[in-house]
Structures are given as structure tokens and as C-alpha cells.
């Protein structure tokens, strides 16, 4: 009994300090050129991974020491992953963000992947305000919003690719699409009628994640801004 009493009254051993794990930021990274540019920037400011994601078929690569995990997704799906909380943050074009009406925080315009949303038509096209405009596009919501803003009624024809073909074959009067250099338009006998939305890649965050991981996100944003500014100065 006394031995047991001594054991119970003995001082407890010191609690071993546990290493606190770094909070992981889950990043939805678009596959392709834009994703490569963004990854190179992030890797340059301490968010790289030991594994080269371009040299693997894996869709998830991570670096726990840096507190970073990348999900490699289709550009059109980035906003979905972030909005629904599968990813904390992501990089997505303003076109996709606007078309999806994603309920996310838009934290930074990276200035990468610059282009513009345009109305384009055959070189000899003349607008007739008295008739319905047939518009071919994959950006249905953006097209409807633009034409509503100028008070025009339209007939939308949703296409998923080769949009330039629609007016050539008489399927539509005009198209609404992204234009970067205009080369594809010119080669197909089309011209820009109106430019109405500048587009570039935006850094977005899930609203709930931002409440819990704002410190990590703000730190990444600060470093990313500095890297983008340094990149701009080199031009």
C-alpha cells in the first residue's frame, strides 16, 4: 500500500515537447503553361516540392517542410475546387472566375496570362441594331452579361472549341472569346469588334479556409507580390 502511495505521489515526468507541424496550404494549380509559370514563382519563394510534378503522373505533390500541397487540375476546375473547400487557394483566369460566378475571395491579380475578352466578327460584318445578334461562345454567362449591359437581345450558341469557325460557316454573326495576340482571328478572316474585359490570372481563396489559415495565405501573398514586382522590374 505504501509503495503504491509513493508511486502516486511521485512527481510526474516532464511532458515531452512535441514538434508542431506546419499548417499545410492546399493549392489548386492549373495544368499547362500558366500553372508552370505560377509554380516556378512559388518555388522561387520557398514553396517548391522535391518532386517535379511535370515528371510524374501524380496529381498531388507536396512539401510538408514548406507547408505546401499542390493539386494539379484542369484550369476550368480550379475555382470549383477552391469554392467547395477541396483546395484552400488557387490560381485561375479572370474569365473562368467570372463565368463560374465562384463564391471565393479574389486576393491578388498576378498579372500573368494577360489577354482580353472580345467580340469578334468577319471583316465585312456590319451590326444591325434592329435584329437579334447570334453569338457563338463558350462563355455564355459573360456574353449574356455584356450584351445586357448594352441593351442588345442575343441568341446564344454554346460551343466548346473552334469558336472562330461559327461565323465562317454562318452559324453565328459574331463570337465572344478570349484574344491574346489576335493571330488566330486574322488567319480566319475575323476582326475584333469590341474589347470589353481584361483578363489575367487571379489568386483566389476559399472563404472558410481564409478564416483559419489567413496567416499562411497572407505570408504567401506578401512573398508572391514581391516576386511579381521583381519580375516586372527585370522587363
How should each PLM-predicted stretch be described?
Residues 1-235:
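Domain-level signature for soluble enzymes in the chorismate/prephenate branch of the shikimate pathway
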